[in-house]
């Protein structure tokens, strides 16, 4: 967003005084049509180092790996020397720990699997949490998932208690072998793991051909390698609340709230579907692509053309530079009066490049119209090394002269694609000497009190006009989001870094 968050905040305060909030609280919508639910063939939840069975906080049952066919023999089991009270006991109370390489072997049917690795860095069996540096690989696929990985350094930098890494790997044989190898370059190095999930994945990446963003507005088809591994960096329910794995429509995925990743004060407005609008999946969008709760909520820029033309609705996501990323954007028009083409048309910018001009959700949903989920896949290349800010921005398309100058998004997923050498490796974040900045994960709209009354409304009109005048002088014509005046700070990678902050 150009012009800075202060200017955007003034604009949004003024707009809030003129127009009521668009969120439909407590509305009861018709029962959605989500298609046939996906039932995974393989669904393994392994509580490493534990015996018996236990349920996690989402009600899912995990099996202890003691004596199981998956765990390597004679691998030491350990409990955390002290456990943060915010950390769930399942699967984080126990771990498998070793200073030598070890391999878990899962007999599976062929096909793509979600692989989730759970880590709680603690002192295990008199081993220091800071000494755990290790790699994780899938030898049969020649894929390195993690290298020189430090769960302790990562959680310290992000102020998180535990972390979860999610990958999508393609199994071609009858087994998935997962090898943990301590790093030789670190004294006293060891590897550990608290929990492993292996869940069959629905056909998520072969349904449509992504578009490769070239930067000139002329995207080209991108052929995905069916054998390639991917890492889930972000999975966001835009405009809605977090969705737990038990509420997902396929693969036990977690969907996180998008508010911590919105740039500055330009959060727009979030809302639910109209009571009369049911989410109905078309034939080309299976229900397992995303749950109906994702499509039943949205975030848009708001009702004021002047405000919307002066900023971009922007999310900032931190990723590893030097990789290609598959960005999946979920759309669904869920409120009247957006029922016809060319009512809401907007442009999509990814990593400061034009990915799509003239995006029209109703037109994409033709002939089904309002309440119809659609999604679009884009592949974006990044250069350099280290950790970088990845911008996702939306802006009204003035060239089409739409009825409403606005943009909408319902959900967002970002996947890292493996390099040709099979690497998905990223850097450990560097802990800061200062306390981490507040992520802003609370309800941002609570920062602006309701404004009522004719006098305040009149002041808002004046403020709106003044803000538009000032901001337009400070901003260039609205195109892709440029670099911000200040750094956004290290924000936690959604599924890549876990979900529980330290107390």
Spans of features found by a protein language model:
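Compositionally biased, intrinsically disordered or flexible polar/acidic segments
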Residues: 2-503
């Amino acid at each position: 967003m150009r012009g800075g968050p202060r200017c955007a905040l003034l604009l949004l305060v003024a707009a809030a005084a003129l127009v009521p909030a668009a969120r439909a609280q407590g509305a009861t919508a018709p029962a959605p049509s989500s298609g046939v639910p996906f039932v995974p063939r393989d669904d393994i939840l392994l509580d490493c180092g534990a015996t018996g069975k236990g349920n996690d906080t989402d009600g899912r049952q995990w099996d202890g790996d003691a004596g199981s066919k998956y765990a390597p023999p004679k691998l030491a089991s350990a409990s955390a020397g002290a456990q943060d009270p915010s950390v769930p006991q399942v699967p984080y109370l126990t771990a498998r720990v070793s200073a030598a390489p070890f391999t878990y072997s899962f007999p599976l049917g062929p096909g793509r699997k979600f692989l989730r690795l759970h880590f709680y860095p603690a002192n295990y069996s008199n081993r220091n949490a800071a000494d755990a540096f290790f790699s994780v690989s899938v030898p049969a696929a020649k894929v390195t998932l993690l290298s020189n990985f430090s769960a302790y350094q990562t959680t310290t930098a992000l102020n998180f208690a535990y972390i979860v890494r999610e990958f999508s790997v393609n199994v071609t044989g009858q087994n998935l072998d997962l090898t943990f190898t301590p790093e030789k370059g670190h004294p006293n190095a060891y590897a550990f793991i608290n929990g492993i999930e292996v869940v069959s994945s629905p056909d998520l990446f072969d349904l449509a051909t992504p578009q490769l963003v070239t930067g000139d507005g002329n995207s080209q088809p991108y052929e995905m390698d069916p054998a390639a591994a991917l890492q889930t960096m972000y999975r966001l329910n835009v405009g809605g609340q977090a969705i737990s794995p038990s509420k997902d429509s396929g693969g036990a995925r977690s969907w996180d709230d998008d508010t911590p990743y919105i740039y500055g004060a330009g959060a727009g407005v979030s809302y639910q579907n109209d009571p009369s609008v049911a989410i109905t999946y078309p034939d080309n969008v299976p229900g397992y692509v995303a749950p109906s709760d994702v499509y039943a909520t949205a975030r848009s820029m708001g009702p004021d053309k002047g405000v919307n033309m002066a900023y971009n609705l922007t999310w900032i996501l931190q990723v590893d530079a030097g990789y290609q990323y598959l960005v999946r954007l979920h759309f669904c028009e869920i409120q009247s009066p957006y029922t016809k083409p060319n009512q809401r048309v907007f442009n999509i910018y990814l990593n400061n490049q034009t990915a799509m001009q003239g995006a029209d959700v109703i037109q994409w949903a033709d002939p089904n119209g309002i309440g119809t989920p659609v999604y679009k896949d884009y592949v974006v290349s990044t250069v350099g090394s280290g950790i970088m800010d990845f911008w996702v921005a939306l802006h009204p398309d003035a060239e089409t002269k739409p009825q409403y100058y606005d943009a909408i998004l319902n959900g967002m997923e970002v996947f890292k694609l493996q390099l040709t050498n099979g690497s998905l490796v990223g850097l450990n974040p560097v802990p800061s000497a200062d306390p981490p900045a507040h992520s802003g994960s609370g309800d941002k709209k609570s920062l602006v009190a309701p404004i009522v009354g004719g006098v305040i409304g009149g002041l808002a009109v004046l403020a709106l006009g003044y803000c538009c005048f000032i901001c337009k002088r400070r901003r260039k014509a609205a195109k892709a989001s440029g670099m911000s005046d200040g750094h956004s700070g290290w924000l936690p990678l959604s599924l890549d870094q876990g979900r529980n902050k330290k107390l």
